[in-house]
Curated annotation (Swiss-Prot):
Catalytic activity: ATP + H2O + cellular proteinSide 1 = ADP + phosphate + cellular proteinSide 2
InterPro entries noted in UniProt: Helicase_ATP-bd, Helicase_C-like, P-loop_NTPase, SEC_C_motif, SecA, SecA_CS, SecA_DEAD, SecA_motor_DEAD
A single Gene Ontology CC term: cytosol
Co-factor note (free text): May bind 1 zinc ion per subunit.
Name the UniProt record assigns to this protein: Protein translocase subunit SecA
Transmembrane spans: none
Reported function: Part of the Sec protein translocase complex. Interacts with the SecYEG preprotein conducting channel. Has a central role in coupling the hydrolysis of ATP to the transfer of proteins into and across the cell membrane, serving as an ATP-driven molecular motor driving the stepwise translocation of polypeptide chains across the membrane.
Length: 864
């Protein structure tokens, strides 16, 4: 009560913020008339002057009114579009690093040109992030006319570009692209071997379109680049064959809310019998446990045509938020293979993670981040807590006159679908266009089938038909059109009303089910009533819908029984609607906690990732790596000889002596580097009563490095860089796998009264320290086993040109080392499959002789 009185007197926080921007608005409008008289060349020349001033230290805020006024004028001249005052306010909010909540049809695409042009003057680059390649291309071309008029360069990052094209796009003042392309380019840059191969610049300023979709909906899906692992796929089929013989609730239980499945004690015994195992929980059977759980999820939780479809004998993921197909993306942890086995298609090899990052941590790297969406207010707390972003509600240019009708609730799904079809037929007969929103392909096809029987013409837009998306969306506002769309397919394209449609009541939005998130429901409503157009929305629900069945509790069903509902009769009751909204709030809270927990765990990995990528970048950029290599040498020798220091002059016991000797041999190949130390076996112990001194070992290894430097000539620096980066990448890849295993089992620590997050942090740090140490040692294991033939040493002078050519070829190979073979990409939602990049050089088998020339098998030498 008191809060509402205070709000009436002083206005809300949002109102006060908008009021504080009035002085900017007055200045911009005051400049409009004067700038309208300037020739085209004078405007671009003035922008060039302002760019120079900014790079000399002038603040962006001080020139904001003038730049915004020039962008407005550019819009009028090249597009015939003038930025409204409310769009100016949205632009100021974006420049200030906030989220601008703007209703559908209010011109978010045009708003972004204001802060983009202003911040481009810093010369550090502005990234405009969209949800798919189509929008990235469209906006870059469409809005690019404004930027080009102002003398600013524009690039676009879409799937299929080579590194040179990407580098040019990132070098532009303003770069459009999808969240996935930006994220994957960052990961790929951190797998490159030479600074000339990098494509991205440092992360300066990003404007994220549909920010709720990217930073909230996709926050749980990390971007992953992976390569093939050695694990066999036969086990997936073997386990899949036993799942139909297990009975739900007897042999296994399913938690639909948590989307998890688990074997019961009886189920464990049955699985052991069917698989011929003595003990499923024996450590050697750990892979069986993992495969059984994934197969149970594949059969009992994941549904065909809802979570995925089978297309061209492949399992293709359907994005739960947009309804789009995600070709080239795969579920992780063997779940995708379990689905392939379930559907009887080819089971692809499981992949091992080479690099990964969540969108949460990727976007937090930007110095300044802002975003636009039509629906952010319900997630304002999460934006504030996770990203430190404030949501500003921007008023509409024209009043909203759309009618949002109360939900119609039925007892059963068949009753609901019959009512939906009757309502669609009524509206079609009237001539009012209808957009039917469904949350699965299955539902969209069910309604389409019912409409076909009733003779109602319609278009279906779901993951299976998304190639026709633009054409179908363009027609959706025409009189008499019926369009069935899975979720928010077609988002980003406004539905324009046809002639005479406003008089019929505008676009009618019919929701067939409530989504777990109120925001997704609001997005569907937002397709109607754009720019002051009339419109109407209504949701049709049933007690058998997943949301009400899982989260609505029995109170709603009891309430509806007391109200005495008859078959086929709907109810429109505020108490029921409120109960449904509370169910959605509970699910939203649950999903927020999941995302927060994911971030807590990923923050541990993120800190480690930052250290590794920084070390990698320094190694790539450094011209002289010899000091780093010698520093590694000092650290290793000090560590190896530490037990000797601790004895304080006393004789070493035999076990410690043998351990030091073995480590010297393993790390430095000392029997080659320091021939006097030719430890062949335990009988050799008597011949070497004393270990070589630390100084002697250091001198011997440094001597080896000097010889390597002479033999390698000008490519010595490339050799050091190659091995430093190669060993860093190999150890990081193994560390990612170890961290995955740690994460999988860490939840069990809670049963021992220990905090799983703290345990993960502590053990993760220990693993990371071990990995850093392993990098140092593995670099020397590789370098001391490397054999190079000097050109001058060729036996036949006639062979010298060939030897020289070989050395030149090796240098070129080192300078242009490719990324790992057969990379796979997963995470996020993007149109178009990722084509795996392949290495042309033959892969070295684990039992082949090591190419370094040591004479050992690869798996016992550089592949160890």
């Amino acid at each position: 009560m008191l809060g509402s009185i205070v709000k009436k007197v002083f206005g809300s926080k949002n109102d006060r913020y908008l009021k504080s921007l009035n002085h900017y608005l007055k200045e911009i409008n005051a400049l409009e008339e004067n700038i309208a008289t300037m020739p085209d060349e004078a405007i671009s020349a003035r922008m060039a002057e302002l760019r120079a001033e900014v790079q000399q230290g002038t603040s962006l805020d001080s020139i904001l009114p003038e730049v915004f006024a020039m962008v407005r004028e550019a819009g009028k001249r090249v597009l015939g579009m003038r930025h409204y005052d409310v769009q100016m306010v949205g632009g100021i909010a974006l420049h200030s690093g906030k989220i601008a909540e703007m209703r559908t049809g209010e011109g978010k695409t045009l708003v972004a040109t204001l802060p983009a042009a202003l911040n481009a003057l810093t010369g550090k680059g502005v990234h405009l992030i969209t949800v798919n390649d189509y929008l990235a291309r469209r906006d870059a071309e469409w809005m690019g006319k404004i930027y080009n008029f102002l003398g600013l360069s524009v690039g676009v990052i879409v799937h299929g570009l080579n590194d040179e094209e990407r580098r040019a796009a990132y070098a532009s003042d303003i770069t459009y692209g999808t969240n996935n392309e930006f994220g994957f380019d960052y990961l790929r840059d951190n797998m490159k071997f030479y600074k000339e191969q990098l494509v991205q610049r440092p992360h300066h300023f990003a404007i994220v379109d549909e920010v709720d979709s990217i930073l909230i909906d996709e926050a749980r899906t990390p971007l992953i680049i992976s390569g093939p692992s050695d694990e066999s796929t036969g086990l997936y089929r073997r386990v899949n064959d036993i799942i139909p013989r297990l009975k739900r609730d007897t042999h296994y239980t399913v938690d639909e809310k948590a989307r998890a499945a688990a074997l019961t004690d009886e189920g464990v015994q049955e699985a052991e019998k069917l698989l011929g195992l003595d003990n499923l929980y024996d450590p050697q059977n750990i892979s069986f446990q993992h495969h059984i759980l994934q197969a149970l999820k594949a059969h009992s939780i994941f549904t065909r045509d809802v979570d995925y479809i089978v297309k061209d004998d492949q399992v293709v993921i359907v994005d739960e938020f947009t309804g789009r197909l995600m070709p080239g993306r795969r579920f992780s942890d063997g779940l995708h293979q379990a689905l392939e086995a379930k559907e009887g298609v080819k089971v692809e090899a499981e992949n091992q993670t080479l690099a990964s990052i969540t969108f949460q941590n990727y976007f937090r790297m930007y110095e300044k981040l802002s975003g636009m969406t039509g629906t952010a207010d319900t997630e304002a707390v999460e934006f504030q807590q996770i990203y430190d972003l404030e949501v500003v509600n921007i008023p509409t240019n024209k009043p909203m006159i759309r009618k949002d009708q109360p939900d119609s609730i039925y007892r059963t799904r068949p009753e609901k679908f019959n009512a939906i079809v009757e309502e669609i037929a009524r509206l079609h007969h009237k001539g009012q266009p209808v957009l039917v929103g469904t949350i699965s392909i299955e539902t969209s096809e069910l309604i389409a089938g019912m409409l076909k029987k009733k003779g109602v013409p319609h278009n279906v837009l779901n993951a299976k038909q998304h190639e026709k998306e633009a054409e179908i969306v363009a027609e959706a506002g025409q009189a008499g059109k019926v369009t069935i769309a899975t979720n928010m397919a077609g988002r980003g394209t406004d539905i324009v009303l046809g002639e005479g449609v406003p008089q019929l009541g505008g676009l009618y939005i019919l929701g067939t089910e409530r989504h777990e998130s109120r925001r997704i429901d609001n997005q569907l409503r937002g397709r109607s009533g754009r720019q002051g157009d009339p419109g109407e929305t209504r949701f049709f629900l049933s007690l058998e819908d997943d949301l009400l069945r899982l989260f609505g509790s029995d109170r709603i069903a009891g309430l509806m029984e007391r109200l005495g509902m008859q078959e086929g009769e709907p109810i429109e009751n505020k108490m029921v609607s409120r109960a449904i909204e509370n169910a959605q709030k509970r699910v939203e809270g649950h999903n927020f906690e999941i995302r927060k927990t994911l971030l807590d765990y990923d923050n541990v990995m993120n800190q480690q990732r930052e250290v590794i990528y920084s070390l990698r970048r320094d190694t790539m950029m450094e011209d002289d790596l010899e000091p780093s290599v010698h520093e590694f040498l000092d650290d290793i020798i000090e560590d190896i000889y530490a037990p000797l220091e601790q004895t304080k002059g006393k004789a070493l016991d035999e076990e410690t002596h043998a351990a030091i000797a073995a480590r010297l041999e393993e790390t430095f190949f000392l029997s080659r580097v320091y021939p006097e130390f030719a430890l062949k076996g335990s009988e050799q112990q008597e011949k070497l009563p004393e270990l070589p001194s630390a100084a002697d070992v250091k001198k011997a290894v440094e001597s080896m490095l000097e010889k390597l430097k002479r033999d390698a000539g000008p490519v010595y620096g490339d050799i050091l860089r190659y091995f430093l980066l190669e060993e860093l990448d190999r150890n990081w890849k193994e560390h990612l796998l170890n961290m995955d295993h740690l994460r999988d089992g860490i939840g069990l620590r809670g049963y021992g009264q220990r905090d799983p997050k703290q345990e993960y942090k502590r053990e993760g740090f220990s693993l990371f320290q071990n990995m850093l140490w392993s990098i140092k040692e593995s670099v020397f294991r590789a370098l001391t086993r490397l054999r190079l033939q000097r050109v001058e040493e060729a036996a036949d002078p006639a062979e010298q040109p060939e030897a020289a050519g070989l050395q030149e070829a090796k240098a070129t190979e080192l300078r242009h080392k490719e990324q790992p073979a057969e990379l796979s990409y997963s995470g996020g939602d993007e149109d178009g499959a990722k084509t795996p990049s392949r290495r042309n050089a033959p892969k070295v088998g684990r039992n082949d002789p090591c190419p370094c020339g040591s004479g050992k098998k690869y798996k016992k030498c550089c592949g160890a």
